[in-house]
Amino acid sequence: MRNLLENIKKNSQKLLNLTPKDKEKIILKLAQILRENFKIILEANKKDMANFTKSGAMKDRLLLDEKRILALCEGLEKIAYIEDPIGKISKGWKNYAGLSIQKMSIPLGLICVIYEARPSLSAEIAALMIKSSNACVFKGGSEAKFTNEAIFTLVNKVLKEFDLQDCFAMFTQRDEILQILAFDDLIDVIIPRGSSNMIQEIANNTKIPLIKQNKGLCHAFVDQSANLDMALKIILNAKCQRVSVCNALETLLIHEKIAKNFISLLIPEFEKFKVKIHAHENALAYFNNSNLKIFKANENTFDTEWLDFALSVKLVKDCDEAIEHINKHSSLHSETIISNDASNIAKFQRLINSSCIYANASTRFSDGGEFGFGGEVGISTSKLHARGPMGIEDICTYKYIINGEGQIRE
């Protein structure tokens, strides 16, 4: 294992020698080969889906169909045309001694990405790594074994064409990843995408820095001044469009003075999707005449990521109480306020600590593609290095370039 990782680290220099046009060409070729061979990917995915016996969020994340593969290819093409971040000078100045000092972007180095389900990441991450000149080792979940292998085989064909096959590796066995976690002298950072238990297990077994994507415990607060038609549209999109994703809504906070009117609008729409309601005792009565399944909230309700047609609901007396609740229970992912009160919006966006804070928009936009990044390595809920959807610039770091004319420090 050490020899393999040392070889990847050594060969990563090839990525630094790629021109922006080289990278564009490689990534476009990657999109092309995936599009031309989508049936191979679908066949592999059918095997994984047949072997996967659980239902719910992970099954949806595991699924690939023609539409999702074509969307993946379109995302890769967007990545291809994004400005190359490497070698970019973000600032420059001269110091008192006349030294020219510049801050230049560089790759993080050798990145390990560990992910559950989501086999499309095998291609998306490869494109992002090529664009940012990072070497990478991949570890996909066993539930997506056949799909990951099919996609990475196609990725590797493109890498071989450009003599980059030694800059990347995919691992499929659990014991291999446990070995990798020991090489903090070779791997620069780990980006885990999966359950809280998986992320915690990795953190407990390595000294390598992690950029974490915690669970997506996303909140919405419908303020007293909200346009209720707008609020209804946003809540339905955030909760019901795709429940298996980390930017889906999990907790709804409603100003107590509009609770009756707004919940009466919500109920018939939620009945269409059979949304299960986990209501705080102050909200229970408002759902009594509905055909929804209603549960009284317990001590764990507001810390639960449902990843299902289920929603925690609580009434609050004002924006301050909403902010206090969110900061207590949030996973630091995405939160939204629906309001026409500019001061409450400003307060909400200033005082909440999460990585993405919306006003009058759905949390479903927390995504690298939606942010214009082309794709994402993950959505970081960490506070160090990167936060929110991680595009190409977020898997770069920097160094200082200093040029002089014989200066010495007196």
UniProtKB/Swiss-Prot annotation:
Cross-referenced InterPro entries: Ald_DH/histidinol_DH, Ald_DH_C, Ald_DH_N, Aldehyde_DH_dom, G-glutamylP_reductase_CS, Glu-5-SA_DH, GPR_dom
Reaction(s) the record says it catalyses: L-glutamate 5-semialdehyde + phosphate + NADP(+) = L-glutamyl 5-phosphate + NADPH + H(+)
One of the record's GO molecular function terms: glutamate-5-semialdehyde dehydrogenase activity
Alphabetical keyword list: Amino-acid biosynthesis, Cytoplasm, NADP, Oxidoreductase, Proline biosynthesis
Top-level division of the source organism's lineage: Bacteria
CDD domains xrefs: ALDH_F18-19_ProA-GPR
Pfam family, one: Aldedh
EC number(s) reported in the record: 1.2.1.41
Pathway participation: Amino-acid biosynthesis; L-proline biosynthesis; L-glutamate 5-semialdehyde from L-glutamate: step 2/2
Gene Ontology CC entries for this record: cytoplasm
Listed GO biological process terms: L-proline biosynthetic process
Entry's localization field: Cytoplasm
Record family assignment: Belongs to the gamma-glutamyl phosphate reductase family.
Free-text function comment from the UniProt entry: Catalyzes the NADPH-dependent reduction of L-glutamate 5-phosphate into L-glutamate 5-semialdehyde and phosphate. The product spontaneously undergoes cyclization to form 1-pyrroline-5-carboxylate.
NCBIfam families: PRK00197.1, proA
PANTHER family the UniProt entry points to: DELTA-1-PYRROLINE-5-CARBOXYLATE SYNTHASE, GLUTAMATE SEMIALDEHYDE DEHYDROGENASE
Descriptive protein name: Gamma-glutamyl phosphate reductase
Gene source species: Campylobacter jejuni subsp. jejuni serotype O:2 (strain ATCC 700819 / NCTC 11168)
Lineage: Bacteria, Pseudomonadati, Campylobacterota, Epsilonproteobacteria, Campylobacterales
Primary gene name: proA
